Regions:
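Conserved class I S-adenosyl-L-methionine
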Residues: 1-43, 56-60, 77-80, 102, 146-174, ...
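Class I SAM-dependent methyltransferase SAM/SAH-binding core
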Residues: 56-106
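A short acidic, Gly/Pro-enriched loop at the edge of an enzyme's catalytic core
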Residues: 108-117
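A short glycine-rich, Lys/Arg-flanked "PGG" loop and its adjoining helix->strand segment in the class I
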Residues: 131-146
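A C-terminal cap/extension of S-adenosyl-L-methionine-dependent methyltransferases
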Residues: 208, 212-275
Length: 275
């Protein structure tokens, strides 16, 4: 894969400023819970977090005992990751390896089938052509391994502007496959059926899918966390909606859990008896 300018860097500082706000906490917590349903603590797995950023998901998995490799192109975000890791117990940090690199060069950085889990969460939308990145994920994922892919929901792009009363933008969003996100970056959305088919072509079969941010997507980006009791009520409602139709279908984000097909032994043709 060639190096790719994803455009995320233009919104990086806004992204960093919004960490810890309600919308981001809901996203991170839901994704973590949804993945945990498919990833037991034992045995420890080899995890690759593509576009690991500040390390929220990677550190949660390292705390659970998994060996995690985080790769990101951003020096600033990797510094944030290291600062967060320094506050963890030593054994957690020992399970983490950080690599500064481009998500477009994964196959140059890592060997084939070298990970049991690959996270690609909030990354695919910044690739105008997602195919090469999906190719790389399939290449790096061991047979039976899990891919966790979080994308903007292309089937519901009109929901956010519509709920905010921006009727012109809501009308434009129907049939679109791109949008301008909250950090000011023009990004791409994925339709669930299309992404499911794209993963299947790369021998990764979707086992389950979830919605993320059904109820809280339209809150202001700067909205701080409420008291703990209210936060837990929000998370319970969001978690239930994220696994229940029709609510999950109109979530802002889609979280797909796919499993890499096991290698099938080559069948030998029986020898013909001598004539």
């Amino acid at each position: 894969m060639d190096s790719v300018d994803t455009g995320f860097s233009a919104g990086e500082e806004q992204w960093r400023a919004r960490l810890g706000t309600l919308r981001e906490v809901v996203r991170q917590d839901l994704v973590s819970r949804q993945l945990a349903a498919h990833l037991p603590d034992l045995p420890p797995r080899r995890v690759l977090d593509v576009g690991c950023g500040q390390g929220t998901q990677a550190l949660r998995l390292a705390r659970r005992g998994h060996q995690v490799t985080g790769v990101d192109a951003s020096t600033r975000l990797l510094d944030d990751f290291r600062a967060a890791m320094a506050a963890e117990p030593a054994e957690v940090g020992d399970r983490v390896r950080l690599v500064q690199g481009d998500a477009g060069q994964l196959t140059d950085l890592f060997a084939a089938s070298s990970f049991d889990v690959v996270l690609c969460q909030g990354v695919l939308m910044y690739f105008p052509d997602p195919g090469p990145l999906l190719d790389a994920i399939g290449h790096l994922l061991a047979p039976g391994g899990i891919a966790s892919v979080l994308v903007r929901n292309g089937d519901a792009l009109a929901m956010r502007p519509g709920l905010l009363g921006d009727w012109d933008e809501a009308e434009k969003a129907f049939g679109e496959d791109s949008y301008r996100n909250r950090i000011g970056v023009h990004a791409r959305a994925d339709r669930r059926a299309d992404l499911t088919a794209a993963l299947a072509r790369r021998e990764m079969d979707v086992r389950e899918w979830y919605g993320v941010r059904v109820f809280t997507d339209t809150v202001a980006s700067s909205t701080e966390l409420p008291d703990e009791e209210t936060l837990q009520a929000i998370l319970r409602a969001e978690e239930r909606a994220g696994r229940t139709d029709p609510y999950r279908q109109v979530a802002a984000l889609l979280h797909l859990i796919a499993v890499r097909r096991e290698e099938t032994p080559t069948r030998r043709t029986p020898e013909q008896p001598p004539s």
